[in-house]
Amino acid sequence: MFNPSEIEAMPLELEKLFRGLEERIMADVIRKLKANGQEITRATDWQLHRLHELGASKIEIKEKIKDALKLSDSELERIFSEVIKEGYARDESLYKLTGAEFIPFEDNKQLQQLIQAVKAQTAEQFQNITNSLGFAVRQPDGTLKFQPIADYYQKTLDKAMVDITSGAFDYNTVLKRTIKELTNSGMRTVDYASGWSNRVPVAIRRAVVTGFNQVVARVNEDNAEKLGTDTFEVSWHSGHRPSHWWGGQWFTRGQLISVCGLGEADGLCGCNCYHSYSPVVPGASVPTYSKEQLAQMEAEENKKIEYNGKEYTKYEALQRQRKLETRMRAQRQDIKLLQEGEANEDDIIGAKVKYRITSDEYVRFSEAMNLPQQRERVMVDGLKNIGQIPKDKILKNAIGDDIIIVNKTTLRGIPNSITQVVNAKGGIDRNYYGPNGRQFKQISNNDHNKPKQHPFGVNGEHAHDYTYDENGKLLRGRGRELSDSERQENGDIL
């Protein structure tokens, strides 16, 4: 779709990226048109608008839609007319085919600025836009050498970056697609020269967020140059790390480096930094926040909230929330691998229960800390409701605790869980597991057909306490009567 002057202005690597971008936008537009009864929705209109702004020809857009949907000229005109009639078209000329056929490259300031930003970000190589060091191995002389797999990883990230920076795709959609593409290839972790290793979702999110912010920073510096200013306002966001206290303030370009650490991994626009900076003109621009507002917001950030005996600032709470999300993503992958490996049913149910326990803790903690749940961070793997437990595999006891239905009793189980086994003659055993995953108690509603050994209760119902020696060897206690609370708790089976 690019015209010759645009192609000539782009290096080969960037041309490939933008051609791929156009193909993905067009494919997504066609998919949405098919899914919505050939109606151009607001989301589809936005994508077509961005496609044209990136240099696509109006006629070629029209022809591609017409061919893909097998429409006649009159049918296509009807679809286009509906958009104008609804009144939400961002550029009516796109559907009327009036005005310029395409935006000439020399007049396409947005495209020029995006290309210049990528050029600066990649030191004119137009590759590895996120500057990821994944799969880089440090050589004896101290230099870094990328493994062959790094090329595939970087190209996949580059696709994600142009999709997001173009404005045609939203962040979460691109993130989900990228993670799915990499995990489907068999990639599970990303390894770094430092010896650090991350699961794919964590590595992708960090690389894309960091890379995107750095490209935006390049655009903002270009804007500053055009405005003739050397002063910038750094954005402020809740939950920032303590060392990023400078959010919401004004700094010169030099101070962005000396004070805010611009260019450093742990500084402004570094790894996992959500701050950005925009040009301002002293004497004309007005700060977003007053000093008093910033002081009040920072005080709120440092206010501590207690949960389970521990106090958390906003940053500390967000860090724990991120850890719980990471744990849930890992647990979802474990479930997927168990299912693919056709593991036994108890193991799969056990993995799902672990996920459910973490998920419940995530809800409780988020509510206690007044933090919004960010389930999209967990569901980004595209595995949907993989952690859902079949209704016939979990029930409630008399006081509402979850009971997991399993096929056999094991001494090791899910920490802080209760399982239930039904024996061949219909008797029920409930197994209790402590914080370390060891079984510490069993409650039975029968005498195991050994009435002399279990002369308890009305029907032989009894309990066994489990203890362990210093080597972890089981010391199983003799049977005993149920306490009143145990009878109340298990009244549904007694």
Predicted regions and their residues:
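Intrinsically disordered, low-complexity regions enriched for glutamine and histidine
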Residues: 273, 440, 446, 460-462
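Conserved beta-strand and immediately adjacent loop positions that scaffold enzyme active sites
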Residues: 274, 429, 464
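Histidine-centered catalytic micro-motifs
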Residues: 277, 455-468
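Short active-site loop/helix that positions an aromatic residue
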Residues: 280-285, 468-472
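Active-site or metal-binding loop neighborhoods of secreted/extracellular toxin and effector enzymes
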Residues: 463-494
